[in-house]
Amino acid sequence: MEYFNVGKIVNTQGLQGEMRVLSVSDFAEERFKKGSQLALFDDKDQFVQEVTIVSHRKQKNFDIIKFKDMYHINAIEKYKGYTLKVSKANQGDLQEGEFYYHQIIGMPVYEKDRLIGYVKEILQPGANDVWVVKRQGKRDLLLPYIPPVVLNVDVPNKCVDVELMEGLDDED
């Protein structure tokens, strides 16, 4: 079965079985909602078990979650450092124009017909996502995911078209 990363358990939260998760999910509110099915993977990326979310809330930059049948710190402490993943079957359907991060990472990024680089990772610093574009012989480019910059994301043909606004590329 194919799985995709949605977060990393970085610590426990209190004594009642809550965990602090650093999300890397494109749809965190959907992914961590009550009833969601996720999988735990250990630090060697080995499947451990399926889990069900029973509660979720945001606190600062973290998602605080609790699993079904794990209601005390002693039951969850061993999961610190583990990765949460969603199976392909549990990803859910997308609306037109939406996509998953794993579909974008690795895509080539073009301005007109000039290859700029490849999407290396996607950051979530605040109001909009920022795509990190790895370029050959240059520093990584931080590309805000906003309409004037990202013109088209063609998932089937695996390419991203952009228009770099003045000041975005400090190496040109």
Curated annotation (Swiss-Prot):
Entry keywords, A to Z: Chaperone, Cytoplasm, Ribosome biogenesis, rRNA processing
Superkingdom as given in the UniProt entry: Bacteria
Domain (PRC barrel): residue spans on this chain: 95-168
GO biological process, alphabetically ordered: ribosomal small subunit biogenesis; rRNA processing
InterPro entries the record matches: PRC-brl_dom, PRC_barrel-like_sf, RimM, RimM_N, RimM_N_sf, Transl_B-barrel_sf
Record carries keyword Metal-binding: no
Main location per the UniProt record: cytoplasm
GO CC, alphabetical: cytoplasm; ribosome
Subcellular localization: Cytoplasm
Gene3D superfamilies for the chain: PRC-barrel domain, RimM
PANTHER family: RIBOSOME MATURATION FACTOR RIMM (PTHR33692:SF1)
Record family assignment: Belongs to the RimM family.
Biological function: An accessory protein needed during the final step in the assembly of 30S ribosomal subunit, possibly for assembly of the head region. Essential for efficient processing of 16S rRNA. May be needed both before and after RbfA during the maturation of 16S rRNA. It has affinity for free ribosomal 30S subunits but not for 70S ribosomes.
Name of protein: Ribosome maturation factor RimM
Organism: Streptococcus pyogenes serotype M49 (strain NZ131)
